């Protein structure tokens, strides 16, 4: 990153660019070395120009959403990290249809805020997401969900800026959702950099607000009872295998709950949570991940794939 590009970032983004920013401050795991620059665009125009200049100068960039499904290595990230949480938190309700309502939601809005809005306004369809950390944009990008529902169930359209700076909109018929994956049918977003989700249209039904709040509270209670509290984590660390027992059960059957490497430990509450006891490094978590993968593979012949995105050096 040359001095001219640094000067442009400082001139345009001022206090919205942070140099050598520790990523441990921006991930739910609380680990990770510094990013060369963390930049928070406020508008689509700023985002497009930032992406265009990165591409023109061959500077790598990645998107930071809620940081809840992200493990950054200890030496950090070279290039630009685009913060899509700070200024992208709007909710716009359109004219209701007979069967429900349509919302346009900023990619940086937290799932928690969206779930509260839906319940408060008698809009059904988001209860499955209660307790899932992160932002709407990040949740769509990985098709976050549970056995009770997925983001793909409620998404009607996605607005994006492509890796070459184009602003595009894709309707439901153009979108493909699968387990922990989102893609575009007949993809024209394929460019040297990833598309950046800026907004999402959601289709929600109608229900009694008090009933929705009660269902949300029950969902919250169940998650609290079965998942670790008091430690930093990324949520479920491994994808569930396509067949057979889920990852957490395999880890439990292998006797790995409580296994620790440095400050990282397999949660006693849920085997698919690798948690930071307060002093973990990314290296600790990666070493623990590899140990769990090896022990599960040796015992059951199953290779666990990480659900978290692992980035950096």
Curated annotation (Swiss-Prot):
Active site: 180, 236 (proton donor), 307
Cofactor dependency: FAD
Molecular function per GO: FAD binding; UDP-N-acetylmuramate dehydrogenase activity
Pfam families attached to this UniProt entry: FAD_binding_4 (PF01565), MurB_C (PF02873)
Limits of the FAD-binding PCMH-type domain: 31-207
Entry's localization field: Cytoplasm
Reactions mediated catalytically: UDP-N-acetyl-alpha-D-muramate + NADP(+) = UDP-N-acetyl-3-O-(1-carboxyvinyl)-alpha-D-glucosamine + NADPH + H(+)
Domain of life: Bacteria
Enzyme class (EC, first level): oxidoreductase
Cellular component terms (Gene Ontology): cytosol
EC code: 1.3.1.98
Pathway involvement of the protein, from the record: Cell wall biogenesis; peptidoglycan biosynthesis
Gene Ontology BP, a term: peptidoglycan biosynthetic process
InterPro entries registered for this protein in UniProt: FAD-bd_PCMH (IPR016166), FAD-bd_PCMH-like_sf (IPR036318), FAD-bd_PCMH_sub1 (IPR016167), FAD-bd_PCMH_sub2 (IPR016169), MurB (IPR003170), MurB_C (IPR011601), MurB_C_sf (IPR036635), Oxid_FAD_bind_N (IPR006094)
Keywords: Cell cycle, Cell division, Cell shape, Cell wall biogenesis/degradation, Cytoplasm, FAD, Flavoprotein, NADP, Oxidoreductase, Peptidoglycan synthesis
Family (UniProt): Belongs to the MurB family.
Role summary: Cell wall formation.
Matching NCBIfam families: murB, PRK13905.1
Protein name: UDP-N-acetylenolpyruvoylglucosamine reductase
Lineage start: Bacteria, Pseudomonadati, Thermodesulfobacteriota, Desulfobacteria, Desulfobacterales
């Amino acid at each position: 990153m040359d001095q001219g590009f640094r000067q442009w970032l400082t001139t345009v983004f001022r206090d919205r660019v942070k140099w050598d920013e520790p990523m441990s401050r921006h991930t739910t795991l609380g680990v990770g070395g510094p990013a060369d620059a963390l930049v928070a665009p406020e508008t689509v125009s700023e985002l497009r120009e930032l992406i265009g200049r990165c591409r023109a100068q061959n500077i790598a960039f990645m998107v930071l959403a809620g940081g809840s499904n992200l493990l950054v290595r200890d030496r950090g990230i070279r290039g630009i990290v685009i913060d899509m949480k700070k200024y992208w938190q709007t909710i716009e309700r359109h004219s209701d249809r007979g069967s429900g309502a349509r919302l346009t939601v900023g990619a940086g809005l937290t799932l928690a805020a969206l779930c509260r809005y839906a319940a408060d306004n008698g809009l059904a369809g988001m209860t499955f997401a209660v307790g899932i950390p992160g932002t709407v944009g990040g949740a769509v990008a990985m098709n976050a969900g549970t056995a009770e529902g997925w983001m793909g169930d409620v998404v009607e359209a996605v607005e994006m800026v492509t890796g070459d700076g184009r602003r595009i909109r894709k309707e439901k018929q153009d979108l493909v959702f699968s387990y922990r994956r989102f893609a575009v049918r007949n993809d024209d977003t394929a460019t040297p950099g990833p598309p950046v989700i800026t907004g999402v249209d959601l289709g929600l039904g109608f229900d009694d607000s008090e009933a929705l709040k009660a269902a949300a509270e029950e969902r919250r209670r169940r998650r609290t009872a079965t998942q670790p509290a008091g430690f930093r984590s990324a949520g479920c660390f491994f994808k569930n295998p396509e067949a057979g027992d889920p990852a957490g059960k395999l880890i439990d059957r292998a006797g790995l709950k409580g296994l620790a490497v440095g400050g990282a430990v397999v949660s006693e509450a849920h085997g698919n949570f690798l948690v930071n006891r307060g002093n973990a490094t990314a290296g600790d978590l990666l070493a623990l991940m590899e140990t769990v993968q090896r022990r599960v593979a040796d015992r059951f012949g199953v290779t666990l794939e990480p659900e978290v995105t692992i980035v950096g050096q």
